[in-house]
Swiss-Prot record:
GO biological process: ribosome disassembly
Record keywords, A-Z: Cytoplasm, Elongation factor, GTP-binding, Nucleotide-binding, Protein biosynthesis
Name of the protein: Elongation factor G
Family under the similarity heading: Belongs to the TRAFAC class translation factor GTPase superfamily. Classic translation factor GTPase family. EF-G/EF-2 subfamily.
Record-annotated tr-type G domain positions: 8-288
Record-linked InterPro entries: EF-G-like_DII, EFG_II, EFG_III, EFG_III/V, EFG_IV, EFG_V, EFG_V-like, G_TR_CS
GO cellular component labels: cytoplasm
Length: 699
């Protein structure tokens, strides 16, 4: 089957915004006008096509990026293929935004005309900068009370440090909003309310807006000629670019991320969506316009590039795993190069495993169509993959490559969870493992001491929704506990312990003597074991038992029962009995030997120190630093990034719970932070006493 649409006619883009700026409604309108949706779904009544998880429809927030393929006939009458990814705007779901930005070529940033640039707009904008994603801006909700297009333009400059190239001016605002002025064609588009936005009239610019339109067209031309020497020279000589040249310059500047074309409208009232779709064709990149994807050769580890070309070897990135109620597990993948046929065998180079593509689906929100073949630039859903997880590379087994992996933040909050009924234990385990496979920012583990199941995620809403999904999709009711910190223990000085284990009261006896030196491991946090036995005082075959015995005690330290780090043990002497000694006897002896020694070797409690990066507007720097200091934080430095300030600090995890709420209120929601594990550090003695008292009773 040959490729139906040329790769230069593809547009892979996402819609990103603050929560409630109208992303889902805008996507709905796009699907409606491109003919994929027969009825417009409203978020207000929980019927939106993209929001296909039950919870999203209830909460009216988009949680999962749904990938949709649709088609649009541009101004030139030629049909283009759109692959659209809808992304969430809530801070707990930034992982979804990150992973969709990684596989997109361009994006539409949505603003609420009333609120302008909101905190989460800043967050997703910075994420898009990280991946250098070309963006256009759509100033939505122009019909809303308080809508102010010109203030939004100003906020893009002051809050995002970005240049918006105004392509349209609004005609009227709030309830009077009825159309836009096209600054390239210099005409006005007035929508007919009764046609659901499908029809509009092209008329002359209203008399009272002509001067403003001229002023903004001049600004538009000045900005775009600035990126091209020849155009700039001609402009200085009084020769203005024609409309096609202006479009070509806007396209170039957008793809090079020099500036961002800005449009306006109201998706809810069906005004301004079609010109936005024409702009996607005119200004956002095709897969051919973006740099080749970088990777490393699986065998030689040399740097290589894969270009958006069907003739190149197959390479694709799995960016999302989803459980589909009808098909089972689906892996969403972006094909960067080559082509893929149904039934093909591909290699997962991250896991070093072969996978077979059982079914290949083209997704439209929550309906699907089976396809036989897919090409470079496509975003497809694959069924039948067993080993693949988010961020893995799938490729041609004969030309293996590892594409740059996605980075996922470490979970920052963990809670204990247990099923309400014993019978649900197994179902809960299965449900949690399924959910963890879908979402790399969600982790599940079992606490060795208490046997409790611990779940960890990006925030309280994130974990709420996991528990909620478990109840809805897997019918498991669960009880959750309070957040916990993973402490560790270590020793701080050298200690030599001599221990004899004997049991010789009738029957087969047990005998083993060990003399071991315990000390901090200078090489790091791992456990290191050495034997310096000479002369056979402990026979060779018993030495693994000595190591095993010590290792079995490392999981529970002497202070509060936390796992131990950074211990080195050297077996220097011992004794055995010809009949009564065994591997087990030496295991028991070394276990008891370490238990005794740990109490005498300066045991110390360690806590996880987190590397915290706060990005905040300058106004809040003093408050943020003061607050981090009050949390026993150590400020490592600060620097300017655009118009924001980045503060780096190391802070104990124990003092970071509820931090997101504090930071939001301290900065009116404008600051954001990331937190990753850095190292373990000794707990101050006054805090250690409290922790020991709290946990010793539990262990």
């Amino acid at each position: 089957m040959a490729r139906e649409y040329k790769i230069e006619d593809y547009r892979n883009f996402g819609i990103m915004a603050h929560i409630d700026a109208g992303k889902t409604t805008t996507t709905e309108r796009i699907l409606y006008y491109t003919g994929k949706s027969h009825k417009i779904g409203e978020v207000h009544d929980g019927a939106a096509t993209m929001d296909w998880m039950e919870q999203e429809q209830e909460r009216g927030i988009t949680i999962t990026s749904a990938a949709t393929t649709t088609f649009w006939k541009g101004r030139d009458g030629k049909t283009r293929r759109f692959n659209i990814i809808d992304t969430p705007g809530h801070v707990d779901f930034t992982i979804e935004v990150e992973r969709s930005l990684r596989v997109l070529d361009g994006a539409i940033a949505l603003l609420d005309a009333n609120a302008g640039v909101e905190p989460q707009t800043e967050t997703v904008w910075r994420q898009a900068e990280k991946y250098n994603v070309p963006r256009m801006i759509f100033c939505n909700k122009m019909d809303k009370t308080g809508a102010d297009f010109y203030r939004s333009v100003e906020m893009i400059k002051t809050r995002l440090g970005a240049t918006a190239v105004v392509m349209q001016l609004p005609i009227g605002a709030e309830t009077e909003f009825k159309g836009v002025i096209d600054l390239i064609e210099m005409n006005a588009l007035i929508w007919r309310d009764e046609s659901l936005g499908a029809q509009w009239d092209v008329v002359e610019i209203p008399e009272d807006m002509k001067a403003k339109a001229e002023e903004y067209r001049e600004k538009l031309i000045e900005t775009v000629v600035d990126i091209d020497e020849a155009a700039m020279e001609a402009y200085l000589e009084g020769i203005l670019p024609d409309n096609d040249q202006i479009r070509a310059l806007v396209r170039r500047g957008t793809i090079d991320v020099k500036f961002h074309p800005m449009f306006c409208g109201t998706a809810f009232k069906n005004k301004g969506v079609q010109p936005l779709l024409d702009a996607v064709v005119d200004y956002l990149p095709s897969p051919m316009d973006i740099p080749a994807i970088k990777g490393i050769d699986f065998k030689t580890e040399a740097d290589i590039e894969r270009h958006a070309d069907d003739a190149e070897p197959l390479s694709m990135l799995a960016f999302k795993i989803m459980n589909d109620p009808f098909v089972g597990s689906l892996t969403f993948a972006r094909i960067y190069s080559g082509k893929l046929e149904k039934g093909a065998s591909v290699m997962n180079t991250v896991k070093d495993k072969r996978e077979r593509v059982g079914r290949m689906l083209q997704m439209h929100s929550n309906s699907r169509e089976d396809i036989e073949e897919a090409f470079a630039g496509d975003i497809v859903a694959l069924a039948g993959l067993k080993e693949t997880t988010t961020g893995d590379t799938l490729c041609d087994p004969l030309k293996p490559v590892i594409l740059e992996r996605m980075e996922f933040p470490e979970p920052v909050i963990q809670i204990a969870i247990e099923p309400k009924t014993k019978g649900d234990q197994e179902k809960m385990g299965l449900a949690l493992n399924r959910l963890a496979a879908e979402d790399p920012s969600f982790r599940v583990k079992t606490d060795q001491e208490s046997g409790q199941t611990i779940i960890a995620g990006m925030g309280e809403l994130h974990l709420d929704i996991i528990v909620d999904r478990m109840r809805r999709e897997f019918k498991v009711e669960a009880t959750v506990g309070a957040p916990q910190v993973a402490y560790r223990e270590t020793i701080t000085r050298q200690h030599e312990e001599d221990y004899t284990h004997k049991k010789q009261s009738g029957g087969t006896g047990q005998f083993a003597r060990v003399k071991i030196v315990f000390e901090p491991n200078p090489e790091g946090d791992d456990f290191k074991f050495e034997s310096k036995i000479v002369g056979g005082s402990v026979p060779k075959e018993y030495i693994p038992g000595v190591q095993k015995g010590i290792e079995s005690v490392l999981s529970s330290g002497p202070l509060a029962g936390f796992p131990m780090l950074g211990v080195k043990a050297t077996l220097i002497d011992g004794a055995f009995h010809d009949v009564d000694s065994s591997v087990l006897a030496f295991e028991i002896a070394s276990r008891a030997c370490f238990r005794e020694a740990a109490k005498k070797a300066g045991a110390q409690l360690l806590e996880p120190m987190m590397k915290v990066e706060v990005v905040t507007p300058e106004d809040y720097v003093g408050d943020v630093i003061g607050d981090l200091n009050s949390r026993r934080g150590q400020i490592q430095g600060q620097e300017s990034r655009g118009i924001a300030v980045v503060i780096n600090a190391n802070v104990p995890l124990a003092n970071m719970f509820k931090y997101v709420d504090n930071l939001r209120s301290m900065s009116q929601g404008r600051a954001q932070y990331t937190m990753t594990f850095d190292h373990y550090s000794p707990v101050p003695s006054n805090v250690a006493t409290e922790i020991q008292a709290k946990y010793s009773g539990q262990k």
